[in-house]
Amino acid sequence: MKAYALLYSVLASLTVLELAGATGVTSRDSDYGGFGTSDDTAHKARGTSSQCTPFSIALSSSDTAAFDTSFVAISPSGSYGLVQDGLELFLDRPPGQITTKGNVNNKVAEGATINSTFTLLHGRVTFTFSGPSVAGVVAAAILIADQHDEIDVELVGGDPQHWQTNVFAPAPHDDQPLYGVFGEIEDYPRGPKSVDETHSYTIDWNTERVQWSVDNATVRTLRRDDTKKNGALHYPTHPARLQLGIWDASSPAGTSEWARGPVDWNTAPRRMSAKFEHVEIECPY
């Protein structure tokens, strides 16, 4: 994600502090912004014990109490809804006339964002969900810390036969943000698949590496020592919450290019959605 997501991250952090009070739930899906770690700091963090509680929820309108206890919405109430077989996060067409210049729209839709009311430090998190296969639209399931460390799964609608993984934990002395340096485009290993089909995406995170899987097939391992850039490690070391979201990547230009955007609202549905069916946390560390 690019600068648009960073701005939204800052604004959403303020909003959710007002909503959640002492729950400690903050921030928005952003690959960028926050603090990295020096070698010394990261070395100390390697000895940090896991803070993880097993958790499992089948998202459904038949059990709203479990959802209300475990998650808090950043976006307005009308931007999401529980149905019998999942949680739908909506992205609605912006009001008024939308014009496109180059690969940027003059208006960007506000999508739904849901945060967990709890954090974890290390563990295995599986998100079962799908997103729209519409260019310029991104559905995301991420781990995000108050310090803005991130571990991401992203479904880019403009590239529906692949999905993306990323880690972002910038160091304060970087000359410039390392946008996309640790991002990677992944295949679906068991034949042609699409982001608009339901799949189970897993982030397995410990002190030494992050591993991503889809439908129980491991596709990527990023080791802590491989995140060293500019003399500093860029590895997530802080407790993080779960974040579920859908967003419009039609601006700025760099974001839109990454997301194969902008959204063509002449052909795209007026309302699109990502559907999350199940979330599970395992604590093997």
Outline where the language-model segments fall.
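Classical eukaryotic N-terminal signal peptides for Sec-dependent ER targeting/secretion
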Residues: 1-11
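GH16 jelly-roll
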Residues: 3, 19-213, 217-285
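Hydrophobic h-region of N-terminal signal peptides that target proteins for export
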Residues: 12-19
